[in-house]
Amino acid sequence: MRHRKSGRQLNRNSSHRQAMFRNMASSLVRHEVIKTTVAKAKELRRVVEPLITLAKSDSVANRRLAFARTRDAEVVGKLFNELGPRYQERPGGYTRILKCGLRTGDKAPMAYIELVGRPEAAEAVEADDAE
């Protein structure tokens, strides 16, 4: 019975899931928007949001915890130097999931997961307003 077992299995074993979400979290932090399935996006939110909350208070211990979860020094640097200060006043909800139709081939529901308030998105909106 799966009573009180949270999280999706996604038809993978635990080490595969852990590696997949570690890679997806690194990609999301690096690029600030990625395209994936809706189920993976909803699970990825549970991985990335605590990382950003951790990055809001910069300390050696927090950097080591973030590195243990991502295994990528570049991502840890961006988390603590850019994203932590950017979301200092926001109490949570750092990601947004936008559904974008079905994948060609297997009709899996796809979605973009992005970081809220990313500078590229703000510049695009300002450019549209100027026209």
From Swiss-Prot:
Q: State the PROSITE patterns in the record.
A: RIBOSOMAL_L17
Cite a single Pfam family from the UniProt record: Ribosomal_L17
Recorded superkingdom: Bacteria
GO terms (molecular function) for this protein are: structural constituent of ribosome
For this protein, the record's Gene3D superfamilies field holds:
Ribosomal protein L17 (3.90.1030.10)
Alphabetic keyword roster: Ribonucleoprotein, Ribosomal protein
Q: What GO cellular component term, any one, is given? A: cytosolic large ribosomal subunit
Any one GO biological process: translation
Under the heading InterPro entries, the entry gives: Ribosomal_bL17 (IPR000456), Ribosomal_bL17_CS (IPR047859), Ribosomal_bL17_sf (IPR036373)
How is the quaternary structure described? Answer: Part of the 50S ribosomal subunit. Contacts protein L32.
The Swiss-Prot or TrEMBL record describes its family as follows:
Belongs to the bacterial ribosomal protein bL17 family.
Q: Under what name is this protein listed?
A: Large ribosomal subunit protein bL17
Q: What is the lineage of its organism?
A: Bacteria, Pseudomonadati, Pseudomonadota, Gammaproteobacteria, Alteromonadales
Gene name linked to the record: rplQ
